[in-house]
């Protein structure tokens, strides 16, 4: 999972429909022996990983609990060239009909997206 996605996971607005809120969701997720392997990201040319990412102030202790218990682990062997590519941006470019999205993903994946007209490709 990418850092930007993990930050969103820690936003409690996504869990308002659950009786137990974010605690219920995280209890279900992590009770299944799930470990998040965290892919870093670049933000203003600074590498962000599990050690320096910032979550909502209300979630700091919950995040620290998962980090301290090795439920969130940094991926160390990552491709630096991929750090500036975001899935949401690729999807946005597909939907807008821009051609430059193809350079950001493997050719076999772009071929499949085009063949099956996935993600709004036309």
Regions found by a protein language model. Name each.
Residues 1-122:
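Active-site cores that bind ATP or allylic diphosphates and position pyrophosphate for catalysis
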């Amino acid at each position: 999972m990418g850092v930007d996605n993990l930050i969103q996971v820690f936003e409690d607005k996504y869990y308002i429909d659950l009786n137990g809120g974010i605690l219920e969701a995280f209890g279900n997720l992590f009770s299944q022996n799930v470990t998040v392997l965290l892919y870093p990201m670049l933000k203003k040319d600074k590498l962000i990983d599990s050690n320096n990412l910032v979550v909502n102030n209300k979630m700091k202790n919950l995040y620290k609990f998962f980090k301290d218990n090795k439920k969130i682990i940094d991926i160390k062997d990552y491709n630096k060239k991929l750090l500036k590519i975001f899935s949401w941006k690729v999807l946005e470019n597909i939907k807008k009909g821009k051609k430059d999205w193809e350079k950001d993903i493997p050719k076999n994946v772009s071929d499949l997206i085009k063949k099956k007209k996935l993600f709004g490709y036309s």
